[in-house]
UniProtKB/Swiss-Prot annotation:
<keyword id="KW-0808">Transferase</keyword>
<dbReference type="GO" id="GO:0000287">
    <property type="term" value="F:magnesium ion binding"/>
</dbReference>
<dbReference type="GO" id="GO:0005886">
    <property type="term" value="C:plasma membrane"/>
</dbReference>
<feature type="binding site">
    <location>
        <position position="69"/>
    </location>
    <ligand>
        <name>5-phospho-alpha-D-ribose 1-diphosphate</name>
    </ligand>
</feature>
<feature type="binding site">
    <location>
        <begin position="88"/>
        <end position="96"/>
    </location>
    <ligand>
        <name>5-phospho-alpha-D-ribose 1-diphosphate</name>
    </ligand>
</feature>
<keyword id="KW-0328">Glycosyltransferase</keyword>
<dbReference type="GO" id="GO:0032263">
    <property type="term" value="P:GMP salvage"/>
</dbReference>
<feature type="binding site">
    <location>
        <begin position="92"/>
        <end position="96"/>
    </location>
    <ligand>
        <name>GMP</name>
    </ligand>
</feature>
<dbReference type="GO" id="GO:0000310">
    <property type="term" value="F:xanthine phosphoribosyltransferase activity"/>
</dbReference>
<feature type="binding site">
    <location>
        <begin position="134"/>
        <end position="135"/>
    </location>
    <ligand>
        <name>GMP</name>
    </ligand>
</feature>
<keyword id="KW-0660">Purine salvage</keyword>
<feature type="binding site">
    <location>
        <position position="92"/>
    </location>
    <ligand>
        <name>guanine</name>
    </ligand>
</feature>
<feature type="binding site">
    <location>
        <position position="89"/>
    </location>
    <ligand>
        <name>Mg(2+)</name>
    </ligand>
</feature>
<feature type="binding site">
    <location>
        <position position="92"/>
    </location>
    <ligand>
        <name>xanthine</name>
    </ligand>
</feature>
<comment type="pathway">
    <text>Purine metabolism; GMP biosynthesis via salvage pathway; GMP from guanine: step 1/1.</text>
</comment>
<comment type="function">
    <text>Purine salvage pathway enzyme that catalyzes the transfer of the ribosyl-5-phosphate group from 5-phospho-alpha-D-ribose 1-diphosphate (PRPP) to the N9 position of the 6-oxopurines guanine and xanthine to form the corresponding ribonucleotides GMP (guanosine 5'-monophosphate) and XMP (xanthosine 5'-monophosphate), with the release of PPi. To a lesser extent, also acts on hypoxanthine.</text>
</comment>
<dbReference type="InterPro" id="IPR023747">
    <property type="entry name" value="Xanthine_Guanine_PRibTrfase"/>
</dbReference>
Length: 152
C-alpha cells in the first residue's frame, strides 16, 4: 500500500453516527452482527446510537495488521442474517465481504469505509477510500509526545 489514511476516534464516531442515521428506523432491526475484529468498535457505536442490545459476532481472520492472508471462519452468528445489520470497519478487496454475503444473504451489510474493489458487496458505507490506501484505525495506534523542531 502506497498511501495511508489515519482515522481518529472522533472521526470514527462521527462516521458511525452518520451511518446509524441511515439505518433508521431502529425498530426494523433484530440486532447487529459485528465482523471481528474490525467491526467490533463500529458495532458498539451503532448499538449505542440505535439502542440495539442484541449484538453477535462473526469471527473471520484475513489480515495480520498490514498483510492480507488466507481467510478462516473461526465463529459465526446463527441464521441467514434476516433483520440484522452486519458491520465491518471497511470493505477492501471484497474477499471477506463475499464470505459475509454467502453466510448472511438476507443481512444488511454496512461498513464505515469502502474501497472500489469491494464497494459493490456492501449495502451502504460512509467514506470512499482509494484501493491502494492502508487505513490506520484508532485502535491500532497510540498517542505519543513528539518533541518540537526547535528546543527552547
Amino acid at each position: 500500500m502506497s498511501e495511508k489514511y489515519v482515522v481518529t476516534w472522533d472521526m470514527l464516531q462521527i462516521h458511525a453516527r452518520k451511518l446509524a442515521a441511515r439505518l433508521l428506523p431502529a425498530e426494523q432491526w433484530k440486532g447487529i452482527i459485528a465482523v471481528s475484529r474490525g467491526g467490533l468498535v463500529p458495532a458498539a457505536l451503532l448499538a449505542r446510537e440505535l439502542c440495539i442490545r442484541h449484538v453477535d459476532t462473526v469471527c473471520i481472520s484475513s489480515y495480520d495488521h498490514d498483510n492480507q492472508r488466507e481467510m478462516s471462519v473461526l465463529k459465526r452468528a446463527e441464521g441467514d442474517g434476516e433483520g440484522f445489520i452486519v458491520i465491518d470497519d471497511l470493505v477492501d478487496t471484497g474477499g471477506t465481504a463475499q464470505a459475509i454475503r454467502d453466510m448472511y444473504p438476507k443481512a444488511h451489510f454496512v461498513t464505515i469505509f469502502a474501497k472500489p474493489a469491494g464497494r459493490p458487496l456492501v449495502d451502504d458505507y460512509i467514506i470512499d477510500i482509494p484501493q491502494n490506501t492502508w487505513i490506520e484505525q484508532p485502535w491500532d495506534m497510540g498517542i505519543a509526545y513528539i518533541p518540537p523542531l526547535v528546543k527552547s
